[in-house]
Amino acid sequence: MASVHPTAIVEPGAQLGANVTIGAYAFVGADVTLGAGCVLHHHATVEGYTQLGPDCEVFPYAVIGGRTQDLKARPGKPGLKVGARNVFREYVSVHLGTQEGEWTILGDDNTLLAYSHIAHDCVIGSHLVISSHSAVAGHVHVGDHVNIGWNAGIHQFCRIGDHAMVAACSKCVQDVPPFVIADGNPCETKMINVVGLTRAGFTPDEVATAKTLHRLFYREGLNASQALEKARTLPEASGRIVQAFAGFAAATKRGLA
């Protein structure tokens, strides 16, 4: 059974899962679905056509499911789908998709720190940590196990690959490949995320392969097509590191940071 503070507003039509807790002065809109065990702290807002999976936590003054800021938005019912165990700290904002039938999507186990922002139509994987005051613009795709540092900005339509780290205060206007650390204004790939890969259970040989790819793409004077062709001839070409990196590079439309 849900526990709802008497000062909270839960509009008729909202669907509350088992053991949901809604604090003082929180707001839940009519089209919201809250999974079992979700916690909304005082003054938290979940609105719009929003679906939160189980055990999500929304801290004070966060607004989850707000209307997009995209000027192309038209009346309709775009949505937001959020997986399990996501944490939205104070003043976080996550917006709906732009058009009817379009969605902003977050996976599982993401942590969004205070004042961070996820814009319309983004597709976010799982295990993201986005630091305070950072912003991800519309239509950005972020992989799994990504870290985005304080006050970073990610341009519209960019992609960030799995296990990548974007350093604090970076401005990303191109795609950040998997497994790397990117930094700067504009953001550039600097090195392989060795600590992150090791913590994630990648083997020393796989980390070495990632370093080889970094040299191919960034240190040997090759253009992206040449580096990609050479990467596919490596002895490790069938392994998950080369497959992920090469596949990401081949699909880029904005170029690689």
Model-predicted segments: where are they?
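Structural signal for interior beta-strand "rungs" in well-ordered beta-sheet cores
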Residues: 2-183, 187-188
